[in-house]
Amino acid sequence: MESIAAATFTPSRLAARPATPAAAAAPVRARAAVAAGGRRRTSRRGGVRCSAGKPEASAVINGSAAARAAEEDRRRFFEAAERGSGKGNLVPMWECIVSDHLTPVLAYRCLVPEDNMETPSFLFESVEQGPEGTTNVGRYSMVGAHPVMEVVAKEHKVTIMDHEKGKVTEQVVDDPMQIPRSMMEGWHPQQIDQLPDSFTGGWVGFFSYDTVRYVEKKKLPFSGAPQDDRNLPDVHLGLYDDVLVFDNVEKKVYVIHWVNLDRHATTEDAFQDGKSRLNLLLSKVHNSNVPKLSPGFVKLHTRQFGTPLNKSTMTSDEYKNAVMQAKEHIMAGDIFQIVLSQRFERRTYANPFEVYRALRIVNPSPYMAYVQARGCVLVASSPEILTRVRKGKIINRPLAGTVRRGKTEKEDEMQEQQLLSDEKQCAEHIMLVDLGRNDVGKVSKPGSVKVEKLMNIERYSHVMHISSTVSGELDDHLQSWDALRAALPVGTVSGAPKVKAMELIDELEVTRRGPYSGGLGGISFDGDMLIALALRTIVFSTAPSHNTMYSYKDTERRREWVAHLQAGAGIVADSSPDDEQRECENKAAALARAIDLAESAFVDKE
């Protein structure tokens, strides 16, 4: 197997994180965390300054006031550093600016140029379900680029890149997830009220479906996995200490830099370096030469399904045969249910970020994500969380049972009743709720697991699903990483019993799933975790070991990308092979609609 380090992480590529200038362009008032203890994160605004202009302007409005504010920030920073002395403490510095001139998409382009498809970076957005099937933009959007550190695992080989030190190390370990976990055990981030109640910094990346092999080493070894034809990492995590958080309700942006005191000889050095880095981050979003985004033109009926995709890792007959084999195992009592997937391929001249911009229109979902990782770019519109841990509370939300949306409200209501009266889909959903209760129960305090919501209907742009919510209180001696290990992968993408179903998936599917049906999201410095299930996720491979760019439309601008769209269907005793094949095709075609729109909006007009 080709070395991951050699193929993707050569030392020359360590310069992903830009150097901090020796002196900042102008002094900017930086807020340092001062409140230790429990995180309340209320909306208290005392001390949070919002500036409409460039940061330089605010520094000269009132010289004496600015000087007093700067001195107060310095004092608070030193107090926070003193409390964290000897503990590897993390102290946030931030500035709050109004966002009426900036959007999350444009902010991402301010941090990552259009021609840079390799720098690890992310953009998280959300569309939440409102009453009567309405949708609302989620309150917070998050943007980050140039992680200070990366942890990348391929099977049991781990590459750790420290961009601050320019150092690459490699290890062979039993469980790569122990590496970021052990790093976090030495961190004690200062908790404050003024920062938003969202992800503000920490680990961001993805965990592939094959991550389960670190947990089930005997029954699901890597040696027994299907063919690995893309050579993608099994885990990629970037440590982001620079993050932009958009408050879409109050129309402001928190520009945040976390200072790691352990990286500095003195507190004064830490303060000055943090202020300089915050100024650098501010200068990017206040840049007078803000990148221009192509406006695009929406010419498609975005709620329609696209045309079927013809190229797949399995022919139609091969997939139907796999369904029949799975049914034989069900009839024999080996399993109750199994999810069999196949990977479709679509070539396009639209680049991944354009596809993401289109996906936001075609399929808005609670967990929208654009993630540039080592070896691939993920464009996701996930409706479902894999696991969430917030202040010790674990949430698992099985989403299973699907029907298309109607054209009118009356048709929607009819479809909803039809879905809830479908015995097959309801039985499948209850089975997955039981799996969710089992996953949460593994890491929860005795007696704390409960089903908060059972068989609710959630409406999305193209379909509606049956949804339930399972919760539990995380056991005192465990961490969010344990909750992730217990859940990954969830039953909605594997089957029941889970491990036996995955053993059969290894036999019946022809290629490794990679990011599909794994998870992507973030783990905050304080240990809170939100990992979305990697469904409705388009994977663009970028690793040099797997060339996905075959030809050029315009040698100056356009190259052809290969988009991988994977979809699966839940197989039970009375499943029809034809119906399950059609379900896979429909799911992939709905996702491919974003590529249709991206081509129509951004490519065809050139």
UniProtKB/Swiss-Prot annotation:
Localisation per UniProt entry: Plastid, Chloroplast
Catalytic activity field: chorismate + L-glutamine = anthranilate + pyruvate + L-glutamate + H(+)
Gene Ontology BP terms: L-tryptophan biosynthetic process
Annotated organelle transit peptide span: 1-49
Principal cellular location given in the protein's record: plastid
Enzyme Commission identifier(s): 4.1.3.27
Subunit structure: Heterotetramer consisting of two non-identical subunits: a beta subunit and a large alpha subunit.
NCBIfam families linked to this entry: trpE_most
Name of this protein: Anthranilate synthase alpha subunit 2, chloroplastic
Source organism: Oryza sativa subsp. japonica (Rice)
Lineage of the species this protein comes from: Eukaryota, Viridiplantae, Streptophyta, Embryophyta, Tracheophyta
Gene responsible for this protein: ASA2
